Amino acid sequence: MKDLPIIALDFESATKVNTFLDQFDEPLFVKIGMELFYQAGPDLIKSIKSRGHDIFLDLKLHDIPNTVEKAMEGLGKLDVDLVNVHAAGGTDMMKAAVRGLHKYSNDTKIIAVTQLTSTTEEMLRNEQNIQTTIEEAVLNYATLTQQAGLDGVVCSPLEAELLTNKLGSNFLKVTPGIRPQGAAVDDQKRITTPEDAKQLGATHIVVGRPITQSENPVESYHTIKESWLG
């Protein structure tokens, strides 16, 4: 799995994805989320893999254990590099996800979403009825994730240092909410720059609109890549 900034391909069609990818002449690490996968499906996965790119298939599975296990069996056949579930689904569901994935793929990494980077502490308490700090909630979910046998979590860069200290540096910490200095915050709440994310212990960063909506996506990508890789 490449140690590159993961580009969130938040497009609604395969045509727009291919137009975007045609601008690059190097292997990338890209994220395909629900919006795109539900429109374009497995055929797009195969097309992107044929270009030599790594893929994070970001579907955030969250259902009863049996359903997630069977769904993950299907994802295991797609030869993607990274998949995920919601940690809120519980330990049994996460263990089932690992079983399903490993039935067809031992190479694909699997991680769990702790708290979305759009979540604030006020939302955590008033809407999710979780009466702890975000850091405590994320650490609890991440600990359960590690105990269930997953490879890491999706978390804010702001929690990455805590998770490294508690769960070790080999536990993946994939961090959205990355914005270069001066970029628009959009709907993210808990954000940092690429440089700060690395210093805080993130193992991978996810960047979308600052690259995909840039006037010069290739230049923006390389700027972020240089900031991330140092």
UniProtKB/Swiss-Prot annotation:
According to its UniProt record, which residues of this chain constitute the active site? K60 (proton donor)
Q: Name one GO cellular component term.
A: cytosol
Q: How does it assemble?
A: Homodimer.
Q: Which UniProt keywords apply?
A: Decarboxylase, Lyase, Pyrimidine biosynthesis
UniProt-listed GO biological process terms? 'de novo' pyrimidine nucleobase biosynthetic process; 'de novo' UMP biosynthetic process
Its family remark reads: Belongs to the OMP decarboxylase family. Type 1 subfamily.
**Pathway where it operates:** Pyrimidine metabolism; UMP biosynthesis via de novo pathway; UMP from orotate: step 2/2
Task: Look up keyword Lyase and say if it applies.
Answer: yes
Q: Pfam families under this entry?
A: OMPdecase
The entry's protein name is Orotidine 5'-phosphate decarboxylase
Q: Which organism is it from?
A: Staphylococcus haemolyticus (strain JCSC1435)
Enzyme class per UniProt: lyase
CDD domains reported for this sequence: OMP_decarboxylase_like
